[in-house]
Amino acid sequence: KHFPHPFSDGTMKNYSLENPFAENDLPSTVKDQEQAVPSRYQEMVDRGRELLELPKKGGGESRVQVQHGKGRMTVWERIRVLTENDPHITFQNWGAQLDGAGIVTGILNIKGRDVALYGHDFTVRAGSMDATNGAKLARQILMAGDHGIPLIGMNDSAGAFVPAGVGGLDGYSEAFQAMRKISGVVPSIMLMFGYNAGGGAYLPRQGSFLIQPNETFFGLTGPDVVREALGEDITPDELGGPKVHSQSGVVDLSAEDELGALRTALRLLSYLPDNNRELAPFAETSLELEGYVEEEAILLRKTFADSPSGFNTPLDMRLFLQQLVDYGDYFELQPERG
């Protein structure tokens, strides 16, 4: 049996998709809403932007000026040196002023690689540690190990937060344990900035590599305690500066200043794999393994064949490395030790 279309008689013209109860004067877009209620909408937008920028203010303008007066960058300025991309900051809503409780943690994108980062904000409580931000730091360190990405630590801490009592030690305890768990799993590059004592000196040395610029200090205690306990006058540089630490092997690399230390960390990172399951980055080369290099042949001949005492002649191995590796590109660790 044939059933006719329900609207074949032309009744469709009596129907409409428009809502007869709609109020046409209501704003239909975000822009229209902003114009319709400008005060409340703009107030919320401005407040949102203010909250996003609040963490970067740290402990306030006056403390940032003090940091600059000492010739030091803030933690946010150091992050900007490491990457031009906007960092993905994690756990930053800790603290009454969204200051991250004195520690900034996040994920950076450095030349296409994800890198976990933490950095003490010295403008907030002198970057000191308590149980709260210690748990936050441990969480960030373990996250790097779980995701198989390198870790960069920017240490600028006065040590445990004294008013917290033993809570400061609890914070370091969690961070120490986390560092041991990722050891050998992902590479960690630690940088020393400012004046670090106590736990602030213990923690970074547990990393894979340690870089210290000039005009910085880290040690279990400072010169004043040495003077009181031993009656010996000693400067911070003599006790815990980059020169003494480089010669003893505590520090792997030294730098002229903070900027040099950060750039050294970036170059070191370019030689390292993301984790122990992946190969290190490599660059294509047009050189052949069996290729003859005239400069290399001359160097070997002058050192061994033409020397009066043959293999007993002392030589600078760095000259050989420059000839053996592609384009003379290699990265020396602990150059001042021994």
Model-identified regions with their sequence ranges:
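Short, Lys/Arg-enriched N-terminal segments with co-localized hydrophobic residues
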Residues: 1-11
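N-terminal amphipathic, basic-rich helices that act as targeting or association modules
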Residues: 12-109, 114
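Conserved catalytic cores of soluble enzyme domains
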Residues: 14-15, 155-277
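Amphipathic alpha-helical
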Residues: 67-93, 294-332
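Non-catalytic terminal/interface segments that mediate subunit docking, oligomerization
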Residues: 93-119, 123-125, 131, 136-141, ...
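Cleft-lining beta-strand/loop regions that shape enzyme active-site pockets
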Residues: 109-180, 189-193
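Terminal amphipathic helices with adjacent charged low-complexity linkers/tails
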Residues: 257-314
